[in-house]
Amino acid sequence: MEINFVNKSKKNDLDIKSIDGKTVISINVKNQSNYDIDQMIDGVERFLDKKINVNFTNIKGEDAENLLLKLNNISFSYTNPPKYNIPERYFPLLNEVEDYKKIVIEPNKYQDTMLKYFIKKIPKNYTYKKFSLKRNDKNFPLTAAVGAGSSHKSYFLHVFPKKHNKNWDDIFLIGKCVTFDSGGMNIKVRNMEEMKTDMAGSAIIMGVLNLTNKLPKNINLLIPIVENYIGSKATRPRPVLPSISVKTVEITDTDAEGRLCIADAVEYFNEHLYNKNLKNPLLIDIATLTGHTYYISCSTSSIVMGNKKAKRYMDKLYECGEQTKEFIDILQLRENYVKSLKSSVADIKNWSPQCKAGTLVGGAFIDFFVNKNIPWIHIDVAAVVYNNDKVKSYGINLLTKFLEKI
């Protein structure tokens, strides 16, 4: 089976032929919108085997990049004859996208498996620290509370350069890795079958690191690895727990678990990594955080918010989204959002019925823990990594281009 993208004026939009006993599908992209190309690919997917060859004719540069990223939920090999002129930098991106889709689409990848997978993918010029969490872990108390009901251990992984260069910018990427999210004691009543993808944020940043580890930047990955499950030891609603910095959190909803894990990662950064000698530090978290993003973006873009210090970075991220066709929508975080999370028994609660804007409230909760001296961006990708039974290869190209440009 072979699929060709062509760019010719005098050619049908879609041709399916049998040549020497092999099915050859040609998709003409001349004057076609991204939506039209998506529709054509969706229309022929039922003909495709698990392994196909992807070839290009008269398509160059970013057009080829953006087209190939539309081949979601299928596996492919690819060739690069000289006449096709596909940029060399793109082939590592293809590999990372393929790895991302495979790990996200497979269910029941438990914490041990994910930890080994991530460690195996760490570039040679990087190293790591791993933390095995106890049930009432004082170093990562909120993540430990999320994983209390699981029969599998929870972990925290910190990936960082073997040699820190003081002249390079310091970038910190947090990726949510909830291997499966049942909702905990506040059990999900719908769409639980999609929760195998709740570790997409961590898979995205690991792919990004493998594409950017040669850039003149000190890139750190912070990954809480946990399963939010039901069991006799699962965290009940409304306990009050201390965070790493001893800020107290009332857990009013065990299904708002992602923000708890990210808060641990943010405070790990605050307590152990932040210092005044960092050069242009930037903190970014990326997570499948809230289902409310479906109502905002119609599954076409991620939702982004951040603090005032990060405005120029968010503007640059928006530009990169337009270039890569991995779009973002930027929302404003206002003080009244975090006020809705005020607790009578703790410093903050992780969910409140007082504000129905769930995506904004999730961001506001994380913002409560962020060091105000640091530019911080929150990227909620819940609506764009999994839709209509397909894993979407969103985020890797976007963040790679962003880190190349800042």
What is the predicted function of each stretch?
Residues M1-N165:
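Glycine-/small-residue-enriched capping loops at alpha/beta junctions
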Residues K8-L14, I19-D20, K101, Q111-I406:
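A generic structural signal for tightly packed, nonpolar segments enriched in small/aliphatic residues
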